[in-house]
């Protein structure tokens, strides 16, 4: 066998190896894509259980009433709330304290209509919440969770998410009320600082305060704070609470704490 023939054979083998390898690679990708597409189709075909039965615009004042409210989670059959009754008017604050799993967050989820009650009724301004425009109701709720979600965007845009057309002065004012303005201006790019995934650029306390600013700037009729100061030191917490007392004077406020 001549050297040229051997070289020619090796070149042909090399040329054929890549296409054969690609066939196996593409086959694997197609199988993964089919599984992903099936999951996407399942998600897109999901029908929301909570439906909006009214598209009429309305003015919300913020009075919230629970009448004999009972709620049971269908998937676990656990009754989180049983015969709950209370009324809170605009300008009032309701503190909800309790151990983990006692139903504190369930109350908030029912007010936001993430779930509907199993029994009893919830009234907003003396009207059944189920019969009100769902979008209007949620637009008038400012919610600050314990574990805030921030986008991979600038701090400014994360705060403006609560109010898209907010002015620079409104953004700064909201940040000051949340006692995070001083931290923001310490960054090289200030409010233009781009955050990492889920806000990893900021500390836990800073993320919570940016989330508070986002809720405040929205100027909703109902404010909900779900243990949102758990990562903040005592001195800063006192300053924030003092500011929130001023901001929420005419609003219905819910404060949840595990303490």
Q: Could you describe each region identified by the protein language model?
A:
Residues 59-259:
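ABC-type nucleotide-binding domain
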Residues 49-59:
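Pre-NBD coupling/linker segments of ABC/ABC-like ATPases
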Residues 1-10, 20, 30:
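A hydrophobic transmembrane-helix motif
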Residues 15-43:
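Cytosolic ends of transmembrane helices, especially the final helix of ABC transmembrane type-1 domains
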Residues 46-49, 189:
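Flexible, glycine-biased helix-capping/connector loops in cytosolic signal-transduction modules
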Residues 42, 49, 160:
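Conserved E/DxxT/N motif and adjacent residues on the DHp alpha2 helix
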């Amino acid at each position: 066998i001549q050297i040229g023939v051997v070289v020619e054979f090796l070149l042909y083998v090399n040329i054929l190896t890549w296409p054969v390898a690609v066939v196996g690679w593409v086959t694997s990708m197609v199988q993964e894509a089919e599984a992903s597409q099936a999951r996407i189709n399942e998600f897109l075909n999901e029908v929301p259980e909570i439906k909006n039965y009214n598209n009429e615009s309305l003015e919300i004042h913020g009075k919230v009433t629970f009448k004999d409210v009972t709620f049971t989670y269908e998937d676990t059959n656990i009754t989180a709330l049983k015969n709950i009754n209370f009324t809170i008017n605009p300008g009032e604050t309701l503190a909800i304290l309790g151990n983990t799993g006692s139903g504190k967050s369930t109350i908030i989820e029912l007010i936001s209509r993430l779930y509907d009650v199993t029994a009893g009724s919830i009234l907003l301004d003396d009207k059944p919440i189920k019969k009100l425009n769902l979008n209007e109701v949620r637009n008038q709720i400012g919610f600050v969770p314990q574990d805030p979600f921030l986008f991979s965007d600038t701090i400014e845009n994360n705060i403006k998410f609560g109010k898209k057309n907010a002015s620079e002065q409104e953004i700064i004012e909201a940040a000051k009320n949340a006692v995070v303005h001083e931290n923001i201006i310490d960054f090289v790019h200030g409010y233009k600082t781009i955050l990492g995934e889920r806000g990893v650029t900021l500390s836990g306390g800073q993320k919570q305060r940016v989330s508070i600013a986002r809720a405040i700037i929205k100027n909703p009729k109902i404010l909900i704070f779900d243990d949102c100061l758990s990562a903040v030191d005592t001195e800063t917490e006192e300053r924030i609470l003092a500011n929130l007392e001023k901001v929420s004077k005419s609003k219905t406020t819910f404060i949840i704490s595990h303490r």
